[in-house]
Amino acid sequence: MLTRSLVLLPLLLAPALAARAQSTPAAPAMRMAVRLDAERHDLVMEIGPLELPAGSGHQQLPAFHGVVPMSGWIHGFRVEMVDGDGNAAPRETVHHVNVISPAQRELFSQIMLRVAAAGQETEPVALPRMIGYRVHRGQELIVTSMVHNPTGQAYHGVRLRVHFPCTPSSAVVRPVSVLPFYMDVMPPASLHSYDLPPGRSRRSWEGRPAVAGRILGVGGHVHQYGTALRLEDVTAKTVIWEGRPMVDHEGRIVSMPVARFLWTLGVPMRPDHLYRVTAEYDNTSGQTIPGGAMGALAGLFVPDAPARWPAVDPGSPELKLDWRLVHTGNQGGHDHEQGHAHAPPATHGTH
């Protein structure tokens, strides 16, 4: 939360404080900038500057709203942290980043469309140039993020950057438009993290897609002690994907596998089928870890009939709750206040 400035001071202290203010310039305010590097075909969303003291805990940043400066397609994303000297900060200083399109809804629920999501174990996501997520000049995007610094070194003037490789709408060869989709083991528009009991455990959520289409790829995110994340077609009794995290020699998760179904023309998904996402954990600590578990899945989807993708329903209780959670920093289950929570727009349109 941004601290408020003290505006009324004892009169006797005013001269000394005024002199100090002249010699110590105020730290620049954190903000988000959106820019397009047309030569490199790189759309960049940058948040900063941030201060990351050594060993600092979780810091939920405000939900920043930005506007896309171009029309075209984006082909994946990557996240980087750069300090005030232009040097790369460790990837583990990023807890998570989410990019959200408030004018579009999700495939499995009424919540806002999650365009990109990354944790510290997320590798850069690169899509073939023949497919991409369609963006339009003036389209609003929201970026939510959490940072921390588990290292023994402080980092100053840090900037969090989300890079989107892109193709302009003027391109001769137009990519096939795809849409991201998101599923979570917690119900839509709720806290994403939950208490992790000791020993083996699992948690699931089930839902039906709003429209028919094909899954082109899928990946996911779990926390420490996570052993598997799975997507199933319950109706067909088949496992579409199962990912098991890679860990280092200390048991810390360093990456999650990603499945791609491009060359098989995708995995069919039907609205008359029920789908389940399941997270499995093996907590060997012997204690319940408050908010210690999470199971989130994201993928790429090509609808059979894009025009049938439902519009956002401004009156949906699910959407209103999602908007509030996004703007109070509680998506991940961490109790942090942040920014100013504006009311959701009265109407939305699809892109």
Show which residues each predicted segment covers.
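Bacterial N-terminal signal peptides
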Residues: 5-16
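Beta-strand-centric surfaces of beta-sandwich/beta-rich domains
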Residues: 22-214, 219-351
